[in-house]
Amino acid sequence: MLRYALVFFIIAIIAAVLGFGGIAAGAAEIAKILFYIFVVIFLVTLVLGVARR
């Protein structure tokens, strides 16, 4: 379960780099939205993974 949390965290970091790097206005907005979505998913899976132990 923590493996999924790590995967979501890496995806969130990639989305942040693309979103906050100033690549394109449309892509940046999409990346910012994805960043927050994946951060929430990361936190949920992290909590669930810790709760299972």
UniProtKB/Swiss-Prot annotation:
Any Pfam family hit: DUF1328
GO terms for cellular component: plasma membrane
Keywords noted in UniProt: Cell membrane, Membrane, Transmembrane, Transmembrane helix
Subcellular location(s) per record: Cell membrane
Domain of life: Bacteria
Keyword Cell membrane found: yes
Membrane topology recorded in Swiss-Prot or TrEMBL: Multi-pass membrane protein
Transmembrane residue ranges: 5-25, 30-50
Family: Belongs to the UPF0391 family.
Protein name: UPF0391 membrane protein BPSS2216
The organism of origin for this protein: Burkholderia pseudomallei (strain K96243)
